[in-house]
Amino acid sequence: MNVLVACEESQEVCKAFRAKGHNAFSCDLLDCSVGHLEWHIIGDALKILSPELRQDNTRSIWFVTSDGTFHSLPRWDLIIAHPPCTYLTITGNRWFNVDKYGERAIERIKERELAAEFFMQFVYADCDKIAIENPIGYISTYYRKPDCIVNPYQFGDPHKKATCLWLKNLPPLQPTNIVEPEVVYYKNGKSDSPWHMNTMHLPKEERSRLRSKTFPGIAKAMADQCGGEA
């Protein structure tokens, strides 16, 4: 299958599909952090979602990967998208209180609407099979409830990170290896996952990049259950 993994610089999902023999490409505004330049597209994923009319009256999706290679495909058979969640996740809800945060909250509300509209571009993409990932948050109200919610600890990685999946013509992701999640406790009694806590001291951009990365177990399950052997 021709697979587009949109909004992914880590290439975790892309690599999993490549391992199954699929023609998968990651796409992000950032360079890939792994190094498979031949599989990575730098740019706006929305610009390569659908085939465009060429001068010879044929339709195709064309792009250049980071290694400088030109590609032309008839269409995507599967799109897996990871739209930015900064303004969509439930963990940021407190910042939308206009009475408390005023203009700052108003600006965040505008950004949230733009983020939701970006998310919906993948929902309406011209592709037979689609999976869109985001944390628990605004999309469940703006669009609809997800088809399934999974955690890394259900796929062999001992971490909690509730991940929602909205699916089109794909089965809900089934757990493959349930393990005990690692948990740390703060003095106030609240708990957290070590992977999340360990990123708090990092610069904003680096923290966001690491927190958005798909864990290997979920990536492999996506490739196995949504793609299978090519």
Regions found by a protein language model. Give the residues of each.
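Conserved active-site and SAM-binding loop architecture
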Residues: 1-230
